[in-house]
Curated annotation (Swiss-Prot):
Membrane topology term: Multi-pass membrane protein
Organism: Escherichia coli O139:H28 (strain E24377A / ETEC)
Localization terms from the record: Cell inner membrane
InterPro entries: KdpA
GO cellular component labels: plasma membrane
Main localization (coarse): membrane
Family (UniProt): Belongs to the KdpA family.
Residues spanning the membrane: 5-25, 63-83, 132-152, 170-190, 253-273, 283-303, 329-349, 356-376, 379-399, 416-436, 484-504, 526-546
Function: Part of the high-affinity ATP-driven potassium transport (or Kdp) system, which catalyzes the hydrolysis of ATP coupled with the electrogenic transport of potassium into the cytoplasm. This subunit binds the periplasmic potassium ions and delivers the ions to the membrane domain of KdpB through an intramembrane tunnel.
Domain of life of the source: Bacteria
One Pfam family per UniProt: KdpA
Keywords linked to the UniProt accession: Cell inner membrane, Cell membrane, Ion transport, Membrane, Potassium, Potassium transport, Transmembrane, Transmembrane helix, Transport
Gene: kdpA
UniProt-recorded name of the protein: Potassium-transporting ATPase potassium-binding subunit
Molecular-function annotations in GO: P-type potassium transmembrane transporter activity; potassium ion binding
Amino acid sequence: MAAQGFLLIATFLLVLMVLARPLGSGLARLINDIPLPGTAGVERILFRLPGVSDHEMNWKQYLCAILGLNMLGLAVLFFMLLGQHYLPLNPQQLPGLSWDLALNTAVSFVTNTNWQSYSGETTLSYFSQMAGLTVQNFLSAASGIAVIFALIRAFTRQSMSTLGNAWVDLLRITLWVLVPVALLIALFFIQQGALQNFQPYQAVNTVEGAQQLLPMGPVASQEAIKMLGTNGGGFFNANSSHPFENPTALTNFVQMLAIFLIPTALCFAFGEVTGDRRQGRMLLWAMSVIFVICVGVVMWAEVQGNPHLLALGADSSINMEGKESRFGVLVSSLFAVVTTAASCGAVIAMHDSFTALGGMVPMWLMQIGEVVFGGVGSGLYGMMLFVLLAVFIAGLMIGRTPEYLGKKIDVREMKLTALAILVTPTLVLMGAALAMMTDAGRSAMLNPGPHGFSEVLYAVSSAANNNGSAFAGLSANSPFWNCLLAFCMFVGRFGVIIPVMAIAGSLVSKKSQPASSGTLPTHGPLFVGLLIGTVLLVGALTFIPALALGPVAEYLS
């Protein structure tokens, strides 16, 4: 079993790096504001039609463009969900959503979280799935990538005030990266057996003679961007464990690759744009070390089995509860770590049925800010916050003004870095405390004791860090939970983007200092260790008391 797990992890990472390297070169061209071959004429036409200016923006203008697009998308999606019964492509005549569920869902998809307090096949029409959710899957992913584009430019430009043009970046990211790759993935999914139609639900007779209603819909097109954009919201309630979304072992492997593809490519692009590819490799090494350790822990915990079931005489020594038999425990463990290391949240197994330690690792990966590969754009700019913090700590230890890539890190940058890092832990801890203090929060818990608290902690951690996966034993479709999680998702997304853009605006105006004998090397194994230590100390220690009350207490009981 250990050899199989090692081979699975090694194969996954090897294929991932091979695919991400050329994509990283393409992203580097876009960051350097170099149009891809044959696209310049199309871009000019698309900008001329609505009269959008392609002049460079300062950080405030860039931020306002990103926020404006997302707020408009939030309003449109909210009203679309409220009135979906008036809109076309609704063969099942599904009614509009309640205001609190519509708000939660709109915020969820605009913030790239894709938390779902509903069952897709019984709640949303085809129009809502396509024109509402799928569109936001593209736009939220493009928004995250655009923010990291601006931050990378801040390190490579000197004595400037501009970071690029948000509309140009959003257009190029969507048209030349997300749409083509998602189209290829969608066609592959269709070839493998995923659904893509507009038919009404089909009544069929089962082998037992009973009648069953099979949901239909344009699944493959949404499934592709759901994974590529690290969105994670399933067309069906069972998400990627549903055979209509994820029909074969091959589609499952491609889904995992799609989740990590752009975050990995952005690391390669970062090294290429900064002129030192070792910087990108340093980030990948730090992420990969944490990732491999986490996968190993989850695999070990799930192979050991559930002690409570073993005590009752379970006929298997491994924990197969809540897992698809066609995928097995090792693949389910790898997928769980992939989807929570990134801000994806898609699942092929029920995380609520994992062992105490097996479920704690995905929760912890979210709580550290999803900086281990992370979401498209958000993972890298989240890790860059820890890089700046690690550089600052190292500067204090050696008595030098901290600097990174030649840019001095001053008080303003460190205040903004601390603010950005503290946003999500504050939301998680205060949100969990509020839920446990109120009857409305506690009434949603379907399990008592430490596991019930783990369900609450996981939900708030998932929302605040824009993941979207859940311990499904929490009945979250209530006004209290819909509003609480919507607030956590909104602030967790934009409460980090705003200080990140402010940091970019500060760094881009500085001159780049040449490296000297006293400059801290930020590309070697020493800095990789320092960065991992910073993530563990700052990102993880915050949650030790909460984890002790939940999964740790469950493990020891």
